[in-house]
Amino acid sequence: LGHPKALAWLKDKVSGMIGAIGVDIYRHDFNLYPLHYWRRGEAPDRQGINEIRYIMGLYDFFDALTADHSHLLIDSCASGGRRLDFEMQRRSLALWRSDLCWEPTAEQCMTYALSLWMPLHGVGSISLQPYDFRSGMGSTFSLALDYQNPSIWSGATRLLKEYQSVRHFF
């Protein structure tokens, strides 16, 4: 996104698809570690310029999408927290805040720290163990279980009712 021609192509392509298909929510994921790519070709005294250009291009990309489609909601995957800056939050939501998920202590720490700055974020649970489940609670919540297994439903129903009773605190 730091290359103007590539950015222009991407804006046209994605915006065209959003319009043609009638997309209401666009999810942008970032599942890679980009530092290696950003540092390639940078002089030692110019470290960071590729990253800056990429981030500015990403902001421009999101701005173009919302300018073309005023109804569009953008969900930007936080990329392990690397996209949780104020400018990104102005342009999108981070419904999935980090791929460091399913570890109760980490989830509690992120919920506490991010809730001071971001009203909407979360992860969820892959467990029906009450401690694990509660640690994943937040303003957004997903539950990744084997839904084909009938034995999960009573526990899942009980814990989801508990979540519904406290979600207004998030």
Task: List each language-model region with its residue ranges.
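Active-site-adjacent "subsite" loops/lids of carbohydrate-active enzymes
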Residues: L1-A20
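Active-site-proximal substrate-binding groove within the catalytic cores of carbohydrate-active enzymes
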Residues: G19, L32, L58-F170
